[in-house]
Amino acid sequence: MAYKHILIAVDLSPESKVLVEKAVSMAKPYNAKVSLIHVDVNYSDLYTGLIDVNLGDMQKRISEETHNALTELSQNAGYPVEQTLSGSGDLGQVLVDAIKKYDIDLVLCGHHQDFWSKLMSSARQLINTVHVDMLIVPLRDDENGEDD
């Protein structure tokens, strides 16, 4: 089956490049569209204590850093990137909204294979929320012996 529009969900870690390369290799033979999305999962909702931080300035800085990182990934993809999206909130809902709006037929995301990722896997949540094909790519941190 040839996909028409692949959405790459990235966390902006160095491994995001691996996901982009994988999606581009799948898209090229069929001239499929490729888009990037980063979802800033809002963990502040889970924290009920007081924080003495200027959240407005911090959110602006984070937004700028996210935009810059997505732009860099897009420019280094070696393939045209249709959309570069950034959202915040519930990962599953943000992806579902993007899937509908941009007619996505494949979501590609990574899964870090460490203890915390196994315990709090985003992939598990997505499997129950996203109703298009998904490709979950196992990612290993450099400390685990993966060579460049």
Swiss-Prot record:
GO terms for biological process: response to stress. Transmembrane segments: none annotated. Disulfide bonds: none annotated. It is found in: Cytoplasm. The keyword Oxidoreductase does not apply. SUPFAM superfamilies: Adenine nucleotide alpha hydrolases-like. Keywords: Cytoplasm. It comes from the Bacteria. Its main location: cytoplasm. GO terms for cellular component: cytoplasm. It holds the Pfam family Usp. Homodimer. Belongs to the universal stress protein A family. Required for resistance to DNA-damaging agents. This is Universal stress protein A. It comes from Yersinia pestis. The lineage of its organism: Bacteria, Pseudomonadati, Pseudomonadota, Gammaproteobacteria, Enterobacterales.
